[in-house]
């Protein structure tokens, strides 16, 4: 259930943040709120969502409310969210698509032991995902890959499509897709996928969907390495590369909008087992900066932290 709101349409700018109950998403909500924006914090778990809002309100962030959103459920919670925003705020100004999953499972106890052996303050820790012995503790399956693409790519598309009519009512609509540097084209090793995603002029949602379907087919048939996909993190890398491509398509499709994607950096979150170069607060700053670009700000770009980056 959503938080109680006044039954009046407000002129205050309104933002929706997916996956807002913890980590980067929570900090994005906090920082947008600090900038005077009315924030609708969303996540799948109702209890965790209410707890997150209560925590924010206890730290004097009153302009935050919760509404449940399951990005894999394109009918029930998305329609309810859209109705809620229309009733209470009349429009939507900012959409931050932050919800995401890693796409692999981890032998947590052994991985934490490896972190401990390296040392939590060691500069080598941020390179742990590159170590073969660490990758051996991580497992990728078709089911996990399917979930990863469903949340990180298809979920973003579904939420965005439902909320576009409300964004169109804004004087300065913005969409920020939280991506990753691993979604850069230089990490897309399947030749067909690279050809499709790298051709910005020919990009369409249908062509991006082709890449998603190719990857899932190869996962199901155990052909990931045979067909040249990344040997580790194929689902996550592809999901973020497809998200970046979708950002480009959307920016071209709706020139009135500011649509950008950003890698917040390797952030010390629960999903990363506390490994990273940035705190959640610092990672969120990279996202919020783009969400609050001036009205004549850029669109259709990829940012790595605060720097403009090639796709």
UniProtKB/Swiss-Prot annotation:
Q: In which pathway does it act?
A: Alkaloid biosynthesis; morphine biosynthesis
**Protein keywords:** Alkaloid metabolism, Disulfide bond, NAD, NADP, Nucleotide-binding, Oxidoreductase
Q: How does activity depend on pH?
A: Optimum pH is between 5.5 and 6.0.
Question: Which pairs of Cys residues are joined through disulfide bonds in the record?
Answer: 263-305
GO MF terms held by the record? NADP binding; salutaridine reductase (NADPH) activity
Record's GO cellular component terms:
membrane
Give, from the UniProt record, the effect of changing residue 266 to V: No effect on substrate affinity
Thermal activity profile? Optimum temperature is between 30 and 35 degrees Celsius.
Q: Which residues bind substrate?
A: 129, 180
In this chain, NADP(+) is annotated as bound at 21-24, 44, 70-71, 98, 236, 240, 267-272
Per the entry, what this protein does is: Short-chain dehydrogenases/reductases involved in biosynthesis of morphinan-type benzylisoquinoline and opiate alkaloids natural products. Catalyzes specifically the stereospecific conversion of salutaridine to salutaridinol.
Q: Which family does it belong to?
A: Belongs to the short-chain dehydrogenases/reductases (SDR) family.
**Name the UniProt record assigns to this protein:** Salutaridine reductase
Q: Which gene encodes it?
A: SALR
